[in-house]
Amino acid sequence: MAAITAALVKELRERTGEGMMDCKKALEKAGGDIEKAIDDMRASGAIKAAKKAGNVAAEGAIAVKTDGKSAVLLEVNSQTDFLALQDDFKNFVAESLEEAFAQKLTDAAPLIASREAAREALVAKCGENVNIRRLVRVEGDVVGAYLHGNKIGAVVVLKGGDVELAKNIAMHVAASNPEFLDSSEISAEAIEREKGVFLQLNADKIAGKPENIVENMINGRITKFKAEASLKEQAFVMNPEVKVGELAKKAGAEIVSFTYFKVGEGIEKPVDDFAAEVAAQVAAAKQ
């Protein structure tokens, strides 16, 4: 019997829209076989149809709340962008955010558990899979947040400065999605990967050139990579003449951390093949 892991329960929950305990029980009964668990749930009437991998909840909304000293950034997923625009979904997100902020939650797990009944009611009403995916809570001397169209959210923690500065830098983070806070955080492995990519892409240009010229070309690319990847080295979106790190320093502030969320980031979305779907339905009808 396969181990009933939290990841397995989560996958079954995402594919069926059922509660965590129901999914765990179904997996235990099926000996850890997720496909058998789905078939058993269908047979028992617990679900109308198996929601296979195609029913991935990869749309949804990002929500954020801050009081200037702390902030919560939350992602809630739906299967379609249409549902994400509906009041029922928006209310679920807003209530979830308020609870997470009031209880100072630092992880999504307790919020998922406490909001399960409300989630199940929403799923039953809308017929779509809905999931609380992740949340982050930050605290600091000064905290600012920015939300772009409910699809991208960012929070920034400063030491010194003010909320307006933190909000402006959060806006920059939302627009630029930096990978690192500053260039010192960039690992040697990341630099080597970038070097390898550069050499592959520029093989024709490099061929036959002296070693010192090639080295200068590589160093130029790495310098540019560090500037593009690190927040402090990026040109500030509201004033490209100034780097973000310089902006903070001039205001007597230090950037402590940043967090960036984008809806569906990292979730593999299925590619719909309408022709194949119709063909499958026709074939099934002939049987």
UniProtKB/Swiss-Prot annotation:
Residue span of region Involved in Mg(2+) ion dislocation from EF-Tu: 80-83
Disulfide bridge map: none
Keyword Plastid belongs to the record: no
GO CC terms, sorted: cytoplasm
A GO MF label: translation elongation factor activity
CDD domains recorded: UBA_EF-Ts (cd14275)
Alphabetic keyword roster: Cytoplasm, Elongation factor, Protein biosynthesis
Keyword Metal-binding: no
Subcellular location: Cytoplasm
Residue ranges of coiled coil: none
Predominant localisation class: cytoplasm
Domain of life: Bacteria
Summary of the function given for this chain in its UniProt record: Associates with the EF-Tu.GDP complex and induces the exchange of GDP to GTP. It remains bound to the aminoacyl-tRNA.EF-Tu.GTP complex up to the GTP hydrolysis stage on the ribosome.
HAMAP family: EF_Ts (MF_00050)
Family: Belongs to the EF-Ts family.
Protein name listed in UniProt: Elongation factor Ts
